[in-house]
């Protein structure tokens, strides 16, 4: 049983990402490219609220322009981070590869982060294509797989089928092929009661390089659930300091973990409509509205 630690406002201080002396270059950003608003899953808590909306897919011309805009804002002497996102970015893999190639042709000091639900990695051919990618081989491409463990029942296919067995196969495939990857885990109502134990099990079983957490705050009960976040956080930190946990749980250890070289000042988002959202990296995330309401 996890001991109860009371914190009335965990959403304001749950993470410690801003409690570090790492440099924060002016104008630097977590630069997110939404290649498409379409996805091969239909997660029940998805913030994008896309059913019935027409496709929004970036063209190569738009991709080039947005990357030029990002480079114009950022210091040319610092590394630029570009997040390859959706929807499901792997559904637009040709454009994803184009974005990496175009960005690299303009600036060598760049890193790409592919954020994906992982379903495409059921295919050995797609695994082979990824590990043979120039940027993956140069360690310029990191891969984040979304998986919610015991709460994964909310991550369903469009027909309503639970994706958990498919995701276990995906993670097994990645481990078998020695793919470098990280897991993104959303803490929500269906895993909050056991998210510490669940996370430790996932880390030990599937061996990600990092375990990156986010919180679906709207699904939690402040009176009952917020203390569970804080209690588990303290257990993770205890394990980290004791040396029992070697995989960083982001962003719970940023004050003591040297895994990242710098912090980013901004989060900036691009869809096919342009730079739709920009806000401070450690501000509370505003309600998602980047794909505007449309009539087909």
Task: Identify the role of each PLM range.
Residues 64-83, 92-218:
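Radical SAM/AdoMet-radical enzyme domain recognition
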Residues 86-87:
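Active-site neighborhood of divalent metal-dependent phosphoester/pyrophosphate hydrolases
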Residues 155, 190, 209-230, 248-260, ...:
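Flexible glycine/acidic-rich beta-alpha junction loops that bind and position SAM and/or redox cofactors
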Residues 23-62:
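Canonical Radical SAM [4Fe-4S] cluster-binding loop centered on the CxxxCxxC motif
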Residues 182-187, 198-202, 216-241, 258, ...:
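Iron-sulfur-associated redox domains of electron-transfer enzymes in respiratory
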Residues 9-13, 17, 22, 47-52, ...:
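N-terminal charged/capping segments associated with class I S-adenosyl-L-methionine
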Residues 2-4, 244-296:
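Accessory C-terminal segments flanking Radical SAM cores
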Residues 1-32, 76-77:
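N-terminal [4Fe-4S]-dependent radical SAM core
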């Amino acid at each position: 049983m996890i001991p109860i630690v009371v914190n009335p406002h965990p959403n304001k201080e749950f993470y410690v990402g801003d409690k570090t002396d790492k440099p924060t270059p002016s104008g630097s950003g977590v630069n997110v490219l939404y290649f498409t608003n379409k996805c091969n899953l239909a997660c029940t808590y998805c913030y994008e609220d896309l059913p019935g909306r027409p496709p929004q897919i970036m063209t190569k011309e738009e991709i080039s322009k947005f990357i030029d805009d990002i480079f114009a804002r950022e210091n040319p002497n610092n590394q630029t981070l570009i997040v390859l996102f959706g929807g499901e970015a792997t559904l637009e893999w040709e454009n994803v590869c184009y974005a990496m190639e175009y960005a690299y042709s303009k600036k060598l000091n760049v890193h790409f982060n592919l954020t994906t639900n992982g379903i495409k990695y059921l295919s050995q051919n797609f695994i082979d294509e990824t590990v043979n990618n120039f940027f993956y081989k140069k360690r310029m491409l990191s891969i984040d797989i979304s998986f919610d463990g015991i709460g994964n029942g909310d991550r369903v296919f469009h027909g309503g089928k639970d994706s958990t067995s498919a995701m276990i196969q995906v993670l097994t495939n990645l481990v078998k092929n020695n793919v470098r990857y990280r897991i993104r885990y959303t803490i929500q109502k269906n895993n909050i009661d056991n998210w510490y134990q669940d996370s430790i099990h996932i880390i030990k079983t599937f061996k990600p390089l990092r375990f990156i957490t986010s919180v679906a705050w709207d699904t939690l009960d402040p009176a009952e659930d917020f203390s569970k976040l804080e209690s588990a956080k303290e257990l993770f930190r205890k394990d980290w300091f004791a040396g029992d946990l070697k995989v960083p749980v982001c962003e719970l250890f940023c004050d003591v973990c040297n895994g990242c070289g710098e912090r980013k000042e901004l989060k900036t988002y691009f869809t096919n409509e342009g730079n739709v959202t920009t806000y401070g990296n450690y501000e509370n995330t505003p309600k998602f509205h980047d794909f505007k309401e449309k009539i087909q």
